[in-house]
UniProtKB/Swiss-Prot annotation:
SUPFAM superfamilies: P-loop containing nucleoside triphosphate hydrolases. Residues 79-108 have a biased composition (Low complexity). The gene is DHX15. This is ATP-dependent RNA helicase DHX15. The modification N6-acetyllysine is found at K488. Coiled coil: none annotated. Residues 147-313 form the Helicase ATP-binding domain. GO terms for molecular function: ATP binding; ATP hydrolysis activity; double-stranded RNA binding; RNA helicase activity. A motif (DEAH box) lies at residues 260-263. It catalyses: ATP + H2O = ADP + phosphate + H(+). The modification Phosphoserine is found at S15. Its main location: nucleus. It is an enzyme of class 3 (hydrolase). ATPase activity is enhanced upon binding to G-patch domain-containing proteins. G-patch domain-containing proteins act like a brace that tethers mobile sections of DHX15 together, stabilizing a functional conformation with high RNA affinity, thereby promoting the ATPase activity.
Length: 795
């Protein structure tokens, strides 16, 4: 008999003792069952209470979110149905599974989601996090007033201080307005004076709208288009919108056009205002909004026929301003010293913003600040140094929004230091900045029409710029601005406002674009500030010599083609003409290299090694062919980062040049311009390239005088070869790409050319009847006489 069977028999045996033991066990079993039942009831009650609390939480969350959404002009959320199915599942599950499921649910309160109208997907949690921050921006209090003005007026001016949220929010409200209209949906364009702002703001707005950058929200800058057929909101540089107008004169694809940062008065913005003023007369459905960060908006209102003004105050804190008692001899040295002192001595937390004039200065300052802070030892707080200028790639530009390093255990404060060009004055807002260092300088374009010289010069900023810079310190809490100039200089030497770019620029590109737009009467074009007649005449003269305009001032077929290239007229002419010299492939590469930042890196601590590396690429005939050698070597070395580092070459510049070259190639293909090369073994390989350079730059030539200095042809300016040239001799005739005004007059990026090429390629310009007397004229006279007597059968 089995043990189990015997046990069963034993339990049935009629023994009092045994029976009593069995009854006790039964009672224990019953009690256990009862306890478990009570536990289940208690668990169920607790679960019900938790679920009720969960419902209440969800209800409160939905109510607060709906209030937020309604204030944002979005539809409120509906009650989630998923909760009911979850509760049914709870009751069907065992105690353990119900408890674990509920615990997971309670740990993360799910927010009922509404559908993103652009993607037809539920909004992500990040969308709601960003929306809460958006609703705190000062501009949100004015949404109803803005919408009312937008509906009732065709154009108006909006003044909003930097940080008010106008650049990110206003275009989104315009998208809402356009979507509410019946009929075909037109897009919204928002122009920016700087490419960095166009890219970074587009990324931010794409995040706010919960869409992918390049889809519903995109950007367009020179040589880079991040948009698609789905794009309804496009941020772009002002020059790119002007370029779009060439092929779409009434800008039909847009229902609202916003000119942001109009106070900067860039060349393209001023031209756009004139163009748009005419377009709104022909398109009653187009809305134009002019946005400015400064309060002198009256001029814009008058220009746009006394249109309305909407003013949105920023949320600023007081800023304490400090001046230097004496002028600083070396503002870069003073700026670096000030950064170190603030980092070491200031007991308040807060980041620093240092304004400098350009990439070289910024890179140098970043290196020196890092080195000096590292030398101070581990007791000093950590520092994160971030450069900011227009040619940085987008991912590096975004670093300005990173948090500062944390405090050390000894209490030393970690800080972020942003070293920027004047882009950080108004175009971008960097939260966390408490200390601003302002040396008082910026690079500005300056043009002298008499000698046809345009240069970027380091000049003193205006009072308006100084005020904008100081205001960056009071964004989040009271701040301090250290002006590295005297109070007297601020009050008596600085101009009130920055001089409009149109009054200090070469207008060759502008006139070519206006002609392409069909605007022939330049004298009566409605400029907000008309340029000097001499500047306009010089531009017309340049385009006539380049054969872009005929003698009547009308656009030629060549000129129309030149206008399609996003290049200066001389470069555009050179690219097109290179086809006739069988060297368009090489000229494309040179043009691309001239269109990007300097490719040669020359660190302070390794100047000799950098110079030696540069000479490995040097071409005997000059700098243009040296750039070609660099590009060819870069491609032959498979675009290697390490190769660039080893050869002191800026990898970013070469990659940008490669991108520019591809885009220019596509434009050439569109016009069926052949891309070809002379056989490399031919003696004409480099000669043809140099001749093609002359087709564009015959007006930028210098002749070596007997005295040993160069004289620019026709304008008779005494100049020297720039120290950066690879030319190891002084050619008698040189073509130059750039006239640089510093302590001396330099010509930069030079190539050795033959004088006979000048008179053959540009006979109209080298007409000796109106040539000033000089050695160059005498030599050219002899060459022309020889050519006319057919002593030179070919050149």
């Amino acid at each position: 008999m089995s043990k189990r069977h015997r046990l069963d028999l034993g339990e049935d045996y009629p023994s009092g003792k045994k029976r009593a033991g069995t009854d006790g066990k039964d009672r224990d079993r019953d009690r256990d069952r009862e306890d478990r039942s009570k536990d289940r009831d208690r668990e169920r009650d607790r679960g019900d209470r938790e679920r009720e609390r969960e419902k209440e939480k969800e209800k409160e969350l939905r109510a607060s979110t709906n209030a937020m959404l309604i204030s944002a002009g979005l539809p409120p959320l509906k009650a989630s149905h998923s909760a009911h199915s979850t509760h049914s599942a709870h009751s069907a599950h065992s105690t353990h599974s119900a408890h674990s499921t509920h615990a997971g649910h309670a740990g993360h309160t799910s927010l009922p989601q509404c559908i993103n109208p652009f993607t037809n997907l539920p909004h992500t949690p990040r969308y709601y996090d960003i929306l809460k921050k958006r609703l705190q921006l000062p501009v949100w209090e004015y949404k109803d007033r803005f919408t009312d003005i937008l509906v009732r007026h065709q154009s108006f001016v909006l003044v909003g201080e930097t940080g008010s949220g106008k650049t990110t929010q206003i275009p989104q409200w315009c998208v809402e307005y356009m979507r509410s209209l019946p009929g075909p949906k037109r897009g919204v364009a928002c122009t920016q004076p700087r490419r960095v702002a166009a890219m970074s703001v587009a990324q931010r707005v794409a995040d706010e709208m919960d869409v992918m950058l390049g889809q519903e929200v995109g950007y367009s800058i020179r040589f880079e288009d991040c948009s698609s057929a789905k794009t309804i909101l496009k941020y772009m540089t002002d020059g790119m919108l002007l370029r779009e107008a060439m092929n779409d004169p009434l800008l039909e694809r847009y229902g609202v056009i916003i000119l942001d940062e109009a106070h900067e008065r860039t060349l393209a913005t001023d031209i756009l205002m004139g163009v748009l003023k005419e377009v709104v007369r022909q398109r009653s459905d187009l809305k134009v909004i002019v946005m400015s960060a400064t309060l002198d908006a009256g001029k814009f209102q008058i220009y746009f026929d006394n249109c309305p003004l909407l003013t949105i105050p920023g949320r600023t804190h007081p800023v304490e301003i400090f001046y230097t008692p004496e002028p600083e001899r070396d503002y870069l040295e003073a700026a670096i010293r000030t950064v170190i002192q603030i980092h070491m001595c200031e007991e308040e937390e807060g980041d620093l913003l240092l304004f400098l004039t350009g990439q070289e200065e910024i890179d140098e300052a970043c290196k020196r600040i890092k080195r000096e802070v590292d030398d101070l030892g581990p007791e000093v707080g950590d520092i994160k140094i971030i450069p900011l200028y227009s040619t940085l790639p987008p991912q590096q530009q975004q670093r300005i929004f990173e948090p500062p390093p944390p405090k050390k255990q000894n209490g030393a404060i970690g800080r972020k230091v942003v070293v920027s060009t004047n882009i950080a004055e108004t175009s971008l807002t960097i939260d966390g900045v408490v200390f601003v260092i302002d040396p008082g300088f910026a690079k500005q374009k300056v043009y002298n029409p008499r000698i046809r010289v345009e240069s970027l010069l380091v000049t003193a900023i205006s009072k308006a710029s100084a005020q904008q810079r100081a205001g960056r310190a009071g964004r989040t809490r009271p701040g301090k601005c250290f002006r590295l100039y005297t109070e007297k200089a601020y009050k008596t030497e600085m101009q009130d406002n920055t001089y409009p770019e149109i009054l200090r620029s070469n207008l060759g590109s502008v006139v070519l674009q206006l002609k392409k737009l069909g605007i022939d009467d330049l004298v009566h074009f409605d400029f907000m500030d008309p340029p000097a007649p001499e500047t306009l005449m010089r531009a017309l003269e340049l385009l006539n010599y380049l054969a872009a305009l005929n003698d009547d001032g009308d656009l030629t077929e060549l000129g129309s083609m030149m206008a399609e290239f996003p290049l200066d007229p001389q470069l555009a002419k050179m690219v097109i003409a290179s086809c006739d010299y069988n060297c368009s492939n090489e000229v494309l590469s040179i043009t691309a290299m001239l269109s990007v930042p300097q490719c040669f890196v020359r660190p302070t601590e390794a100047k000799k090694a950098a110079d030696e590396a540069k000479m490995r690429f040097a071409h005997i005939d000059g700098d243009h062919l040296t750039l070609l050698n660099v590009y060819h070597a870069f491609k032959q070395n498979h675009e290697s980062v390490q190769w660039c580092y080893d050869n002191f070459i800026n990898y970013r510049s070469l990659m940008s040049a490669d991108n520019v070259r591809q885009q220019l190639s596509r434009i050439m293909d569109r016009f069926n311009l052949p891309r070809r090369s002379t056989d490399f073994t031919s003696r004409d390989y480099y000669i043809n390239i140099r001749k093609a350079l002359v087709t564009g730059y015959f007006m930028q030539v210098a002749h070596l005088e007997r005295t040993g200095h160069y004289l620019t042809v026709k304008d008779n300016q005494v100049v020297q070869l720039h120290p950066s040239t690879v030319l190891d001799h002084k050619p008698e005739w040189v073509l130059y790409n750039e006239f640089v005004l510093t302590t001396k007059n330099y010509i930069r990026t030079c190539t050795d050319i033959k004088p006979e090429w000048l008179v053959k390629i540009a006979p109209q310009y080298y007409d000796m009847s109106n040539f000033p007397q000089c050695e160059a004229k005498r030599q050219l006279d002899r060459i022309i006489a020889k050519l006319q007597s057919k002593e030179y059968s070919q050149y």
